[in-house]
Amino acid sequence: MLRKGDLTQGGITGTLLHFTLPMMVGSFLQQCYNIADTLIVGQCIGAGALAAVGSAYTLMVFLISVLLGLAMGSGTVFSLHYGAGNHVALRRSIFSSFVLIGIVTLILNVAVFIWLGPILRLLQVPQDIYGMMRSYLWIIFCGIVFTFIYNFYASLLRAVGDSVTPLWFLAVSVVLNIALDLFFILQLDWGIQGAAAATVLAQGVAALGIIIYTYRRRPELRWHHEDMCFDRTCLKEIASFSTLTCVQQSVMNLGILMIQGLVNSFGTAVMAAFAAAVKIDSFAYMPVQEFGNAFSTFIAQNFGAGRYDRIHRGVRSAFVTAVVFSLLVSVLVFVFAEPLMLIFVRPDETEIIAVGVTYLRIEGAFYCGIGILFLLYGYYRAIRMPGMSVVLTVLSLGTRVVLSYWLASVPEGGVTGIWWSIPIGWLIADVVGIWYYRYKKFRFQESKA
């Protein structure tokens, strides 16, 4: 009998796409949280506020990546147990993960409130936007508990094959976010603080909704009294996956943060261009990023169920799908780079538009590289090799950071040199990841024979 959310049966390509589509839409809505702030702030307040929100978003993603990494790693464990049909281990891992990530959330919150000022100074945030950026982040982190709750339960539901339910709660919260943005900024004139407050309240709605749904509609995922224990084997498994995935996410966002610091040194105009272009960039490769996450769940469930033949067929199918889609998006972004920048920037801000268009055309030409890299990350996490995902992340980000600082320092490089360092990092990690997959695939098949 086919279980709800079972990814070990059915056609591979159809199963992957059916599972991925709600995740893509959900990620689109997640991006809309910050896009709503960026769009309204940029058009209604000005370039300084746009630069503040854009830089704040980069720092916010880096800090929250700790929680997202823990949730993602736990989700892999959930998928393995669900695929194997071990519901006792599944419930115990849910309880242990919830407590672990909850404690980390509290620690992170306290750390941000204590060290936010020194962090902003370390990032060379210009004085004219320092106050706006500080107040924005302070409000955002007052609601970090909502970020933890939503992402934990969304990860849990996706791990057991339900990618639709998290989408519904996000849809409601995004509509609320945009409405509150307009009300707080245009009607109450709260400025950048209003944008932050709107995001926190909207995330609170999503968090409350998803936790109520899970407890009422998915009783098999609700832990019982006997599950409320810290089993050593369970904790070791969660720690192994979650810690390495957390390290991967943190390293990834640390590299981005270091590049943000370098970009900040070029002034407010370049910061504003980077903030707007990164939002467009995130939307452009967001579908293949979510496809990689869905692919990871697919692989993990089949790995837990021992369906190794299905895993290898899934790899081939996913690779072709990701490459075709990435090439299509590359063409669209390259052709429409300037109109896309005008969504966030006023037409008279020509310097910002020119810098942003250059960024988009360089990155857009290589979306195939990041698409393949997301598949490699997901594959290695799912087959109990999260360490390899970390290696690829360090390789990609390390190359990116070293090259960006070097190219920015030479006369021929400058800001454009920073942009070129990003796809070069993707491609180097792709080559290593694919080579190791081909080697490991042979060993993997041999060991399971």
Task: Give the positions of each predicted feature.
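Generic alpha-helical transmembrane segments of integral inner-membrane proteins
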Residues: 24, 28, 32, 36, ...
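Small-residue hotspots at the loop-to-helix junctions and early N-terminal turns
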Residues: 47-58, 137, 196, 268-283, ...
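Helix-terminus/linker motif at the lipid-water interface of multi-pass membrane proteins
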Residues: 28, 32-50, 120-127, 183-190, ...
